[in-house]
A protein has these predicted regions:
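Short, glycine-/aromatic-enriched active-site segment of Class I SAM-dependent methyltransferases
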Residues: 146-168
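A short hydrophobic/small-residue beta-strand
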Residues: 72, 144-145
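Active-site micro-motifs of SAM-dependent methyltransferase domains
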Residues: 100, 120, 153
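Conserved helix-to-beta-strand junction in the class I
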Residues: 133-139, 182
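Helix-to-beta-strand junctions that scaffold the AdoMet/dcAdoMet cofactor pocket
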Residues: 122-123, 138-140
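Conserved N-terminal segment of class I S-adenosyl-L-methionine
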Residues: 1-108, 112-116, 126-132, 190-194, ...
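Short alpha-helix
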Residues: 167-182
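A C-terminal cap/extension of S-adenosyl-L-methionine-dependent methyltransferases
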Residues: 145, 190-243
């Protein structure tokens, strides 16, 4: 039986119908607030740290990481078309199977590991093994940043089933289970809510915080009799994992 992943990933940017690479790096601008927020809030100050991004696509995050002055960034992706687009944009991305690449890395050699919209592409068995390798390659006190579909969100299925290669969606509790079982010390998840960087985004954040989210929390309270204090309802969410 032919591996459907190999069939799709070879031409991922052509068949996914979304996230097509821009013609120039100026096309990264719409994602700048998101990526710069991650860099500002979760990256160490030391610009010499070793950063590995797996499943980096055509390198949008890598572009902003390098623009922020970090000198030792490596991006890995398994899609020939995505890596081709990255090279066209002059972003240093390598073509490799990320599972095999992780296995080839020395123990405790990475300071920061990034997996944005990646882990949902694996089965449970595959992901469990992948997380074990993440733990192995990460230095003591190292950090992982992940971003994934939210199974708790009323909007989450649009992400979970919006890509044929998605295998899983997650909750903040399932993320804690996954990483704590592999030995990590801290797993904290956060909403991927609108980031204010202008009038429109500020209004979106206000409406999310004071209208949309309270309505859904109220509906959940009616259905179940209570709501978790730290419930996350955005269709994607962030998780910060520390070794």
């Amino acid at each position: 039986m032919k591996n459907y992943r190999a069939k799709i990933y070879k031409y991922y940017s052509n068949v996914s119908g979304k996230d097509l690479a821009p013609q120039t790096v100026e096309g990264f601008k719409p994602r700048e607030p998101f990526y710069n927020k991650l860099i500002k809030e979760y990256f160490p100050q030391n610009k010499e740290i070793k950063i590995l991004e797996i499943g980096c696509g055509y390198g949008a995050f890598g572009y902003f990481i390098q623009q922020a002055g970090y000198k030792n960034y490596i991006g890995i992706d398994g899609s020939e078309s995505q890596v081709h687009e990255a090279k066209r944009l002059k972003i240093n991305i390598q073509l490799a199977n990320l599972v095999e690449y992780l296995k080839s890395i020395d123990d405790e050699s990475i300071d920061l590991l990034i997996a944005i919209d990646v882990i949902e592409h694996f089965t449970k068995e595959e992901l469990s093994d992948l997380v074990d390798d993440m733990y192995r390659v990460l230095k003591k006190d190292g950090k992982i940043i992940t971003h994934q579909p939210n199974a708790t969100s009323p909007f989450g299925n649009s992400i979970r089933y919006g890509d044929f290669t998605h295998e899983l969606a997650f909750t903040h509790s399932s993320m804690s289970q996954l990483f704590l079982l592999s030995g990590f010390n801290s797993v904290k998840s956060y909403e991927d809510k609108p980031i204010p960087h202008g009038l429109k985004s500020t209004i979106r954040l206000f409406l999310w915080e004071y209208l949309v989210k309270p309505i859904y929390k109220f509906a959940l309270m009616i259905e179940s009799g209570g709501v978790e204090k730290d419930i996350i309802l955005t269709k994607n969410f962030l998780t910060i994992i520390k070794k």
